[in-house]
Each structure stands twice: as structure tokens, then as C-alpha cells.
């Protein structure tokens, strides 16, 4: 479980280690005004309260826009979604075509929902369609949504492969493929689906990959399917970022962490905008119920 008050501090509660970690991200001098954003994108960013891109966002912008294959090494909390979506959205024009032009693969249902939500915020003033598909939901409902058309599809590998095999989802129109948290994806056993998804895609496309670590499996995937990728790294593979300050507290169980979170959130001056991340839907429901008792409609 983790939460961030935007542009200041992220607090990560690692359930397996029982330690919450305070992560403070320091931003550089570049502002979003310095990037070549469209007015629509900049207005969305401004409404979200962001002024400075994170290092991975700043470094990725021109590289992704170049159209070359990209491999980014960045850890959780560094703003990876905006790092690849801002340059993609900057150049993605309005189209009436039914089939998607951008495919974003993520390892879990929760990440699909999170990425779709962030894309919808960025495209508030842009006429683009985004659709999320994942396992555990009715596939027939998702087939109907696909048939209505979308510009960007965000998916877990298993469900995307099922939709591709059913011939409902046509992937030959994909111009940009993003694989986010590929190391997690491979750890979860999605290698077979990934390899088969590559076969469904056109050869002429841009490949964009983000990973927290550079493992042998990730490296093999890059060698097999990427063409002279540009590599961006805000830290050495598998090491903490230099611009992150971490402080840990021992919390023995979920309820202790929830109480600690509630205690911290009472500091209204420090925590004005907060994002909370948990490991699964059940945890999200439990945490929401606990915070609702304390904060009411604010939670």
C-alpha cells in the first residue's frame, strides 16, 4: 500500500516487509511549460497541479517523440505513466478508425484501471478514446466495447491475447506498443502471452518498455524484439534512486498501517492531494472503509 501527496512525498507500505517507506521525490528546474506540449495537454497537467516533470518524464519526452524504440529503467513512484503517455498523446491525432493505434500492456487489473484513469485525466481536452481490458471481467462486454472503437487500449497480456485470438480485436493498426513493468509481467508468468502478442502486431511500430530492473529475461526480450533501443535510466538497475529520500516505520499489520495513514492524513497542510495504492481490490475496499469512518466523504 502506498500513497503520494502530489509532487512532494510518497509513502510506500510494503506489505511483505511490514515497513512503510517515505519517498520524497525532488524535481529539477525544467517545468512542463518548457516541454513542447499542446495547449490541451498543458491545461490538463496544470489542472492536476503539476508544474515540474520528474526526471524520467523529462528524459523520456523527446526520445519517445523521436519514434525510436525506448527502454526506460525507473522505479515505482517516478511518474512512468506520464513519461510515456505525454509524448505519445502529444503526437496522436484525432482519427475515426475503429481499431486501436496505441497498446499499453501492464501486469495487473489494478494497473490497467490506474493507467486508464491517468490517461483520461490527460485527455480531458483531447478527443481520444481509451479502453481498459483485463481478466476477471466479462469478456463479451469487453468485446462489445472493442467493437465500438478505441484509440488507446490498456490491457493485461492474458486478456489481450484472448481478445486477439477471438478476432474481435485487430492489432495490425498498432503504431506504438508500451510494455510497463515488464519485469513484474515476466515474474507473473506472462512470457508466453507476450511472445504471442508480438506475433499479432505489425512489424512497423515503436516499442516502448519500462522496467524497475534489468533482468536476463527482460534483456532477452529487448534483444529479440527491439531495434537499437534508446535507453533511459534514472538509477542503476535494481538500486534506489539518488533523488529519493526514504524513511521506514515498522507496522505489523494492515490495520496498524491504516491507523498510521489516518494519523498522517490529519496533517491537512502537508497532505492536500493524496493518491493511495494497495495490492488488490479487497485491500482497497478495507482501507476505504477504515478511512471513511474517520474522514467521511473526504476519503
Protein language model regions, located:
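Conserved helicase RecA-like core
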Residues: 1-299
Amino acid at each position: 500500500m502506498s500513497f503520494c501527496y502530489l509532487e512532494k512525498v510518497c509513502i510506500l507500505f510494503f506489505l511483505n516487509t511490514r515497513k512503510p517507506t517515505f519517498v520524497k521525490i525532488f524535481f529539477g528546474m525544467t517545468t512542463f511549460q518548457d516541454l513542447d506540449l499542446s495547449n490541451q495537454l498543458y491545461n490538463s497537467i496544470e489542472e492536476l497541479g503539476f508544474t515540474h516533470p520528474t526526471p524520467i518524464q523529462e528524459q523520456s519526452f523527446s526520445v519517445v517523440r523521436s519514434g525510436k524504440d525506448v527502454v526506460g529503467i525507473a522505479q515505482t513512484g517516478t511518474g512512468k505513466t506520464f513519461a510515456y503517455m505525454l509524448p505519445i498523446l502529444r503526437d496522436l491525432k484525432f482519427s475515426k478508425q475503429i481499431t486501436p493505434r496505441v497498446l499499453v500492456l501492464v501486469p495487473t487489473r489494478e494497473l490497467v484501471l490506474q493507467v486508464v484513469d491517468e490517461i483520461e485525466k490527460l485527455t480531458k481536452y483531447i478527443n481520444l478514446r481509451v479502453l481498459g481490458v483485463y481478466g476477471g471481467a466479462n469478456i463479451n462486454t469487453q468485446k462489445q466495447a472493442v467493437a465500438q472503437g478505441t484509440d488507446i487500449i490498456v490491457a493485461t497480456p492474458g486478456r489481450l491475447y484472448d481478445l486477439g485470438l477471438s478476432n474481435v480485436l485487430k492489432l495490425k493498426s498498432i503504431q506504438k506498443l508500451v510494455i510497463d513493468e515488464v519485469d513484474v509481467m515476466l515474474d507473473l508468468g506472462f512470457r508466453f502471452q507476450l511472445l504471442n502478442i508480438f506475433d499479432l502486431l505489425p512489424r512497423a511500430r515503436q516499442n516502448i518498455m519500462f522496467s524497475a530492473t534489468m533482468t536476463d529475461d527482460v534483456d532477452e526480450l529487448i534483444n529479440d524484439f527491439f531495434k537499437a533501443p534508446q535507453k533511459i535510466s534514472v538509477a542503476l538497475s535494481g538500486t534506489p534512486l539518488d533523488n529519493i529520500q526514504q524513511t521506514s516505520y515498522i507496522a505489523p499489520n494492515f490495520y496498524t498501517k491504516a491507523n498510521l495513514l489516518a494519523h498522517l492524513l490529519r496533517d491537512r497542510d502537508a497532505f492536500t492531494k493524496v493518491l493511495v495504492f494497495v495490492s488488490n481490490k479487497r485491500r482497497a475496499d478495507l482501507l476505504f472503509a477504515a478511512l471513511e469512518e474517520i474522514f467521511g466523504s473526504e476519503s
